[in-house]
Every structure is written in structure tokens, then in C-alpha cells.
Amino acid sequence: MHFKDLGLHDYTLKNLMYENNCCKFYDAVDENNISYVLKFVPSDVTSEGDTFPFVDRFQVKEGVFLVYSSNDFGKEGTDYFTYTGSGGNEVHISGTSSEAGIKPQFIETCHPKHLKRGTKEQEDINSSTSKKSAVINNFSGEKTPNPRPQSSNISERETYVGILNVKCKNKNSSKIRSEKLVSSVIETKHTPGLASILSKEGTTYPNNADGKHISIVNPSSKIYHSSHKQIVKTPIPKSGLSPIERCPFNGQNIKCYSPRPLDHESPQRDFNNNFQLRILKSSVLQRRQSTQNS
């Protein structure tokens, strides 16, 4: 396709280099056979504005052409449109660091709560860099000395990316000691914590008391059945007891109860005794039935 008298030069499109939903890139030359890159933006697509400087611009019926110098794309590499540039977050590096001449990459780490390290913490970091250590590079796998051991003094927030392999002379297993802050407990000669429990219940704690005198019953030791019923003992009337008689048994006098009173004073008393006896029997029967049902 040939464009004449539309821009500063006459451009001839050679081939399509790249295409997406919003634009197309063409390889083109002018009348002097100088290479250019033309970007075509259709008229129905709203462009936010190109940040890359163009050398020429002209409009056609279908859209707008932006002309870029091919030398400007040459410094970015052969793949113009997938290169992230300085604003990209990720750069894919192929090959080893020694062959490509890539400098060790550093990442910026932030201290917790965005606070500066204290004097003691900074001294520990400086002393750790002076120890003998080997760094295994992620790219080549070869052991190289730790780069820039004095860099911790210059920049506190730079950390070398790699696998740190520290050689320890001590063959025994190292023990890590951790210090925990424990709230101070006032130790007394009494059982700790018992005085506070008794004070909440309003019970005074004597000075000469011993923890052995206090027994705590575990409530879980008493297990009740779901159909448990509290059985009330039936009171035995005192007047219902028969008089005691002495019954000889093997030459010994044994106390035994007579089935009915020895002295019959009146029929009214016999009636009362029989009535109380019937009540006693009925209560016993009720207790037996309740236990059998349960």
C-alpha cells in the first residue's frame, strides 16, 4: 500500500509486524528507502495518547497513522512490543549471569512497621556479613563470595538474591534458645492461686493453712443417668414400732420386735397402728415400683 501526499513523506507499507484489538504496526519505507514503523489506530478506537514520540502523523478515512523512526525501536531490542522497558515489573533473563554479564540483582525489603533498625540490630547485621559464607548463585549454581560485604553500611535495605549456605565449624546440633516474657507471679508459702480463689468466695485464708487440708472434688466423677430420679426416704413413724421382746436363742437373749403390741390398751390404738402400718407398706411398694421402672 502506498500513501502519497498525506504526510511529510511518501510511505510504502512492506509487511504487518504486530496487530491487536486497538492498533496495528507496519514496517514501511519512504521515497528515500528509509525504514519507518507506522502505527495504525482505527477511527472507532479511542486512544489515550501515545507516550512514545513520533516523527510524523497523518489521517486517512479508516483511522490515523503515527510514524516512528526505526532507530528508536532498535535500542529496545528485536522484540519491540513485548519488551517491558524501565517501567516493567518483571524482566526475564536467560542464560547464566557469568555469560551474559548480568550484575547481581537486589530487591528492596522494608523493615516491619517502616521503622529504622536500632543500633543493636544494625551491629548484628554488620557482624553477620563478616562471617565466612558462600552464596550459591541462582543462575550458574557456582559458589561465589558474598558480593559487596560492606554494602550493609551503605544501604540497610538491600538484600542479595540467592541461597545462603553458611558453613558451621561446630558438628553438634545447634540449639536455638528463645526467651519468652512471662508475667511475674508472687511466690508465697501457700498454694499459688488458692488465696485468690478463696478471696473471691469470701473465705478467709489463714496464715497457718496448708494446701493438703483442702480437697477439690471433681464434679465429673458424679455421673447421673438421664432417667435418674431422686428417691426420698420414707420416714418410719416412731409409734409404729412394736415393743422389744427378749427371745432366747442358743442360750442368748436377743432383742426382737413383736408383730403386735404386748399390751392391748384399746381398739382405737390397734386401728391407729394398723393404719400407720398400711401407710408404711404402701410407701415401700411405691419405692419398689419406682426403682423397677427406672
From Swiss-Prot:
Induction: By salt stress. Residues 115-153 are annotated as: Disordered. GO terms for cellular component: cytoplasm. The keyword Phosphoprotein applies. Keywords: Cytoplasm, Phosphoprotein, Stress response. Its main location: cytoplasm. It is found in: Cytoplasm. GO terms for biological process: positive regulation of transcription by RNA polymerase II; response to salt stress. The modification Phosphoserine is found at residue 266. Residues 125-153 have a biased composition (Polar residues). Involved in salt tolerance. This is Halotolerance protein HAL1. It comes from Saccharomyces cerevisiae (strain ATCC 204508 / S288c).
